[in-house]
Amino acid sequence: MKRLGLAALYIGSALAWPEPHGPPSRNVPRDDFPMFNPLPSTDLNTRLIRCEYPSMKGWTYSNKKNGDWLKYVGSKPGEITEYNIDTDNDKYVPQGITRKYHLEVTDESVNMDGTMFDQAKVFNKQYPGPWIQITVTNKLKHNGTAIHWHGIRMMENMFNDGVPGVTQCPIPPGSSMTYRFKASQYGSSWYHSHYSLQYADGLFGPMTIHGPTSAGYDKAVDPLLMTDHLHSSAFEEYHKELEGKPPAMDSIILNGKGDYDQTGDLKKKYRTVLKPGKKYLLRLINTSVATTFVFSIDGHKFQVVGSDFVPIEPYVTDHIAVGIGQRYHVILEGLSEEEAKKNGRYWVRTTPAKGCSKFAPGRGTDDRTGVIYYNKDDGVSPTTEIGAFSLDCRDEPLEKLVPKVKWTVPDPGLNMVGAFEKPADVQLGKWHRPGYPDTDNLVSNWEFGPSPMWINYSEPIIKNLDKDSFPSTWVVYPADDYVNDKWVYLVITGKKLKPLSSQVAVAHPIHLHGHDFVLLQQSMEPWDSTEVNLKLDNPPRREVTLLPAGGFIVIAFKPDNPGSWLLHCHIAWHASAGLALQVLERKEDLKALTLNNPDFDFMQENCRKWDAWHSDKTNYWNPSGHFQDDSGV
């Protein structure tokens, strides 16, 4: 994973690999460059990663006192000679190495429960597989933070889902939190802050979990992150959403590069070189604030082999609409040598979908955000044209998204008629924000029916499981009376919205935490419970889908993961304005998971730290104002 220059927060990662399967030691003289092990774990069976800085000749590891890290001992000192706890890492960061971790999938004999199992499939010859841990250190001044690992199921592990006010209190400035989870899925996704509008300011990055694909390829290309960008902080622009006039984005970015002035300067474009006749895996990730993109490469077609974290039967297309939070794995087949000689340069396009974007006047019109060259990057601009295809804001056709692993969903039958009569309606309204004087002007809000979401950072629901009821602004939907062989069915409608109005996108990207859901029906027509036509035999499966404004979706999931799972619109302005709810799944089982659980204990300690920080108003950006001005998520 390459650093794309998108993060506004220092994220340090430490991966714990049980012996004997840790990264191998490198046979390099210790005085050549800094190379050392961090302080060992208290668990003697765990070995931490080795820290390596091969480009930092003349530096050495320094541990004379607490807080030391690196010290320059060479003969040509530069601007800085030490990296320690007092170093401003907004300005100075030691240059380490790019790390890649590989998992081997093998057949093994494993004794899990006292009986030998001869047909086990395991990672790195061990069961369970290697344990991944990520430590996040908050060095912001006026904000807490929490990091969400988008699409990771967090099976029986709600504590690490990273949603402040739901799964944890925010990490206060000066504190750290280690997220622990098992990667049981594979594909590509992203991690991002779920604290208010932080990710809109750049707090996100890509992640890939390697695994099989449903079609072959020769090489993989780095993750392609397509996003929209504001030149001012989203926190400063948010008032426009409250006033009914959503902020306009300034430019389109692909992998950290954009051309705001739309000059066509190739230095401002993403560029890569391909070989004719080779097949390349592209990992497409939409990390936008408010834009659905249509991805294409002039003159090329590709096979789609995965949607979100779900491998699918391959199909061929020349373009693909990618909603916010959605991901696709596609395989691009390079042109033949003869074709490549005729024209060795092609535009990569991330085109804003019709009705699902808003840019400042004259901005966001140049969708040529990248170039692929054949054999050599000669620095010359392509002259290719965009293909003749639809730029509508809609999901890929459901009949094309066929999961490789087939699921058959039970027919909800007559028992669900009552539930189908009470769908969750996406509504646009006005309200007085909690904690604000009633004399304040009404502001715009979004909601899934009963109330806009407005969480309490100091009282996440995980701390309040003994309560029988919750504040209406927490928007809690209980899912208690289910067992593993039953399903939860949800109908979400946008029937009260008017598409293409000043504040309504043509489609809302709806994301569910903690689960893959099946998409049983999706329509641009108004919801009518008497005309239900569900696809129950191997329906599309993912965790983000587009809800058409004026239409509806019917989704379902297995209630096999106790937790309180956020369901929200991934248009950042809409989530901040309240368009979210939480599904409280199997509350009693969730309570049992909190017993003797170090993650639950850490959550409580982190909340105490948060409360101490939050109680001092001098820590606020505006000490005399309101600390919270949006939903919190």
Curated annotation (Swiss-Prot):
Binding annotation for Cu cation 1: 148, 511
Binding positions for Cu cation 4 per the UniProt entry: 508, 569, 574
Assigned EC number: 1.10.3.2
Signal peptide from the UniProt entry: 1-16
Amino-acid positions noted as binding Cu cation 2 in the UniProt annotation, renumbered to this chain: 150, 192, 570
Positions annotated as glycosylated: 143, 286, 456
Protein name: Laccase ARB_05828
Organism of provenance: Arthroderma benhamiae (strain ATCC MYA-4681 / CBS 112371) (Trichophyton mentagrophytes)
